[in-house]
């Protein structure tokens, strides 16, 4: 089972504040474990524009018509000072990895320099931090009914309002997440 380019959808019973009602986009899943970004937990009052200002990135070809008020996401509890840009495929960045035909992840500064210009990726989201699982940990959490899984949908990833992503991801499975009991029973 490889869950790269899948969503993990937190079950209602998951009460950990870092992951309660979260949707995680799995960027990598292999023999050594898994890595993903929470895509529905905004960092209050932190926008892409704020990040660019803090890093003193100012492009001379900045187009004022391109909005930079996108909220930055809390990607997970690990390395919360490290930025990740999830975006539609576009070549030419120093540290980019293809996740799927529709998505790439970049961690290099050069992608930030394109933001607000005609050279920026068509679709993107910016996250600080990430979530990871050691070998076998995610599989055990799935067996323990911590997460639902479904193949990722780029419309949910890039275009669905943040507050609606948890339900939208569950809808892909034909589930109204609000109708699931928060406790699991055993017969």
UniProtKB/Swiss-Prot annotation:
One GO cellular component term: cytosol
Cysteine disulfide partners in this protein: none
Which protein family is named in the record? Belongs to the UPF0301 (AlgH) family.
Q: What is this protein called?
A: UPF0301 protein YPO0936/y3322/YP_3506
Annotated membrane-spanning segments are none
> Pfam families of this UniProt entry?
DUF179 (PF02622)
Listed InterPro entries: AlgH-like (IPR003774)
UniProt organism field: Yersinia pestis
